[in-house]
């Protein structure tokens, strides 16, 4: 809808933010962004479009580090999975990537940061421990959430911070993040710190129309559940690897 408003009001180019989670999506947020990319491939036949996929923006509202800030201010234990790895970018880096894609991206290109798996991919538990040491506290690993809560006041008084790290069993969490798939055509030579996915206008117009009709039918019905939305996603993205466990990382964090 925003693309059509831009086009109909004389815009020369359209830019849109995607996410690293759109590459081989395993959760609904990543899948919805991948679907957005698919719709924009069709719209790119009428006006140039570029996009950016980037990682978690450090300290942005709702991010892991924002949550750590809130827990630290409230003197609460830290809880995080020890087997999920994530990339992080600063607000400035994310803004620069968006500007580069908007100004320099060719039609249908998706820009992403060149981040090293060995240098920049880090587990949530490692981030928590580095954060606490930066704040002047030594992380103290507890065996359970209950122990972390019960010993919080005692440990914090001794400049130790209670932490509970666990193996992830939550819905829609990848073990690690990726910015592209092995099926996408990449340009890794144009910029030092940025790569580009070069897309062709390949799409199934009938499937896109069916998805739009399905969403509209749910809206007209006035009620829906998660499974109804998932069914629409699976019809358009048969490779969508969503696994529902009934548990969510936000609840554990």
How should each PLM-predicted stretch be described?
Residues 38-253:
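Strand-loop microenvironment adjacent to phosphate/nucleotide-handling motifs in alpha/beta enzyme folds
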Residues 1-34, 42:
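Conserved Rossmann-fold NAD(P)-dependent oxidoreductase catalytic core, especially the SDR/UDP-sugar
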């Amino acid at each position: 809808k925003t693309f059509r408003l831009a086009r109909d009001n004389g815009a020369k180019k359209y830019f849109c933010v995607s996410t690293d989670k759109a590459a081989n999506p395993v959760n609904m947020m990543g899948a919805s962004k991948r679907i957005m990319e698919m719709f924009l491939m069709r719209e790119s036949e009428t006006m140039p479009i570029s996009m950016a996929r980037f990682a978690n923006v450090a300290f942005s509202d709702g991010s892991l580090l924002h949550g750590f800030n809130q827990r630290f201010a409230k003197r609460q234990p830290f809880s995080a999975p020890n087997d999920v790895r994530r990339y992080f970018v600063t607000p400035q880096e994310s803004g620069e990537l968006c500007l580069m894609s908007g100004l320099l991206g060719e039609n249908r290109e998706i820009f992403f940061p060149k981040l090293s798996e060995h240098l920049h991919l880090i587990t949530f538990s490692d981030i928590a421990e580095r954060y606490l040491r930066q704040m002047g506290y030594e992380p103290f690993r507890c065996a359970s959430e209950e122990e972390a809560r019960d010993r919080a006041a005692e440990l914090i008084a001794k400049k130790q911070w209670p932490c509970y790290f666990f193996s992830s069993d939550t819905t829609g969490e990848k073990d690690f993040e990726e910015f592209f798939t092995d099926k996408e055509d990449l340009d890794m030579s144009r910029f030092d710190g940025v790569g580009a996915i070069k897309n062709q206008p390949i799409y199934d117009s009938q499937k896109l129309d069916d998805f739009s009709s399905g969403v509209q039918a749910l809206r007209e019905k006035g009620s829906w559940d998660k499974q109804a939305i998932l069914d629409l996603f699976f019809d358009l993205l048969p490779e969508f690897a969503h696994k529902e466990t009934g548990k969510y990382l936000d609840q554990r964090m």
